[in-house]
Amino acid sequence: LNFLANSIANKLMGEGDEIILSEIEHHANIIPWQMVAEKYKLTINYVKVNDDFSLDLDDLSSKLSSKTKVVSIVGESNLSGMLPDIKEINNLVRSNSDALLIIDGAQLVPHRKVDVQDLGIDFLVFSGHKMLGPTGIGVVWGRKELLNSLDPVYGGGDMIEEVHYDKATWAPV
C-alpha cells in the first residue's frame, strides 16, 4: 500500500485533492495516506461507522466530490469482522466521483474468495504475513490500464523497456 499510495499521489493527485478512508481502517491503510497527504498537501476525510460497525454509506456519499481522487476502504475489519458491501461502495464511488477504489484485503483475502472483476474495484492490496508469509511483503493487484498509467516508485530489473542516458521507458505490465 505504501508503494501504491506514493505512486498514485505522485502521478494522479495534486494539492487540495481528497482521499477518503473509514473510521474503522487498520493503521496500515491510514499511515501511507497520511504520509502522502502531508507531502502533496492532500486532505483525508473519514467515513463514519454505524453502531453495528458497518460503514455509513450516506456519509460516504456526502463526502464524495470532484476533488476525491482515492477511496481506500478495508475489505474486512480486523477489529469487528465487518464486511463492507464493496459492490455498493463501488456503485457510490462511480456515481459520485472519478476516484480510484482501493480495497485493503489483508483480512479479506486469506479467508474469502475475492473476484476483483466482479467487485469492479481498481486496486486490491494485501500483506503476505497474514497468510503465514514473511513480514514486509505484499501484493498489489490493479487494473492493467491503471498500473500502466502509474510511474514506478523504485526502478530496476525487468521493469525497464529501454534505457538511454537522458531517460528510461518502462516495460508494460
Language-model segments: what does each one mean?
Residues 1-173:
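Pyridoxal 5′-phosphate
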